[in-house]
C-alpha cells in the first residue's frame, strides 16, 4: 500500500525550495524546473500544488511573513524590553531571517505596478510599523521614554531605519554585520530613551 501523501508538507517543501531559490538566484530564476530540482521532484509535482508562478510567489511570501511573525512573538514573549526584542527580531540577524528578507525584497520589487501585491506588502509593513509604534507608546506610559516623544513619528522612523539597515546588511554584509545591526538598534533606543 502506498504511503499517505501529506499535501500540506509537500506544499511547504515547495515553498521553502522557492524561497531558497529566490534568495540564491533572484525571483527571475524562479521556475518549476529549478524548484523541482531542489526537492528532487518533478515539475508535475510543482504544478499540481501551484497552478501559477504568482500563486507560488504569494504563498512563499505569506509563509516567510508567518515565520517572521512567529519569531517576533517568541522574541517578545517574556522580554523585559519588548521594543528592543521587536526591533532585533525584525532584522536579518541569522540565516532564517536573511532568507525571509531576501524573499520580501524580491516580492517588494514585483509589487511595483501591481495593486494587489502592493496592498499585501503595504498591509504587512503597516502591521509591523504599528507594532513598533504601540511598543513606543508602552515605553512612554511606563516612563522608559520621555512623554515629549511622538510615538507615530518615532515608530515610522524606527521602522524605516530597520528596513534600511536590513537592506544594507544584505547588499554589504561585511560592513553591516549582525553585531553592527544590534549596536545600531541599541544606539537608537538609547537616544530615544534619553530624550
Region spans (language model):
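Solvent-exposed, amphipathic alpha-helical segments
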Residues: 13, 17-24, 71-75, 103, ...
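N-terminal intrinsically disordered/low-complexity leader segments
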Residues: 1-9
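Amphipathic alpha-helical segments used for helix-helix packing
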Residues: 95-119
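Helix-turn-helix
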Residues: 13, 17-55, 59
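A ubiquitous short alpha-helical element
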Residues: 56, 87-93, 119-126
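Short, basic, alpha-helical segments at the C-terminal edge of helix-turn-helix-like DNA-binding modules
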Residues: 62-68
Amino acid at each position: 500500500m502506498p504511503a499517505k501523501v501529506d499535501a500540506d508538507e509537500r506544499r511547504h517543501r515547495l515553498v521553502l525550495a522557492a524561497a531558497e531559490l529566490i534568495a540564491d538566484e533572484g525571483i527571475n530564476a524562479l521556475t518549476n524546473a529549478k524548484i523541482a530540482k531542489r526537492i528532487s521532484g518533478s515539475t508535475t509535482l510543482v504544478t499540481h500544488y501551484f497552478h501559477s508562478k504568482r500563486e507560488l510567489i504569494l504563498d512563499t511570501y505569506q509563509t516567510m511573513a508567518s515565520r517572521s511573525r512567529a519569531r517576533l512573538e517568541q522574541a517578545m514573549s517574556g522580554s523585559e524590553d519588548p521594543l528592543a526584542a521587536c526591533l532585533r527580531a525584525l532584522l536579518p540577524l541569522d540565516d532564517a531571517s536573511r532568507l525571509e528578507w531576501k524573499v520580501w525584497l524580491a516580492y517588494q520589487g514585483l509589487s511595483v505596478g501591481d495593486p494587489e501585491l502592493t496592498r499585501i506588502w503595504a498591509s504587512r509593513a503597516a502591521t509591523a510599523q504599528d507594532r513598533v509604534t504601540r511598543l513606543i507608546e508602552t515605553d512612554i506610559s511606563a516612563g522608559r521614554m520621555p512623554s515629549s516623544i511622538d510615538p507615530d513619528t518615532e515608530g515610522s522612523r524606527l521602522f524605516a531605519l530597520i528596513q534600511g539597515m536590513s537592506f544594507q546588511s544584505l547588499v554589504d554584509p561585511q560592513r553591516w554585520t549582525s553585531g553592527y545591526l544590534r549596536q545600531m538598534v541599541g544606539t537608537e533606543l538609547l537616544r530615544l530613551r534619553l530624550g
